[in-house]
Swiss-Prot record:
Homodimer. One of its GO terms (cellular component) is cytosol. It holds the Pfam family Shikimate_dh_N. Disulfide bonds: none annotated. Keywords: Amino-acid biosynthesis, Aromatic amino acid biosynthesis, NADP, Oxidoreductase. This is Shikimate dehydrogenase (NADP(+)).
Amino acid sequence: MTKQFAVIGNPIEQSRSPELHHAFAEKLGIELNYSKRLAPLDGFEANVKTFFDQGGLGINVTVPFKEQAFAMCHQLTERAKIAKAVNTLWIENGQLHGDNTDGQGLVDAIQALNWPLQGTRILILGAGGATRGVIYPLVQAGVTEIVIANRTQQRAEQLVQDLAGSVSEATLRVMTLDQLHGNFDLVINATSASLSGDALVLPETLQFKYAYEMAYGKPSSFLDQAKARGVPTTEGFGMLVGQAIEAFSIWHGVKPNLTDFL
């Protein structure tokens, strides 16, 4: 019987997970079926239970259910505990296990570009769930200082307070989006500001060597401004592939090569 996997979200049509997992499986000679499942906003838990009860082996979770998935799990990886969100589910010894592969996906994508992380100083724009999910893996990869910039400084300060004990190897600081300044190795945009048409201005007081846009496939004023400075830039497709590869390796015990799929 073909192994069954799925991605659950709402909306779900835009998900590229099935195409990625089928590509990984084909490359590695693994037979599987990976489907998209649209869950009603009040029906996520029932959807997960039904899928596993019917013999499904693994689920990826996308917007808006990652926090619900986190709350459902009996066992969590360290990075999922810190992220307080789960994007990868599986059953082991009768218990629901959860992981968050987003941050490792980002790290792997950056390393595939041969951009440095060890000993670097990084600025992340935004203090939402996307930022929370990537800080621990970035610190594990050797980043020594992370500054989180947000429109409301209080939210950034709360995030730093939440994470301080988990990432003691790195310095975490905050600033506001309208007071961006300093020298950084890398700037990561984890806000939707540059996509929604809101002005996200990168002032001359802010200097950086690389720019990463977490979103992909859409116009980005963040990337436009970085390109105008002549710094290397990329968008988030590599992170998408990286997090999918990490989930695939959890389920199948073998890790596809990221650069084969970029």
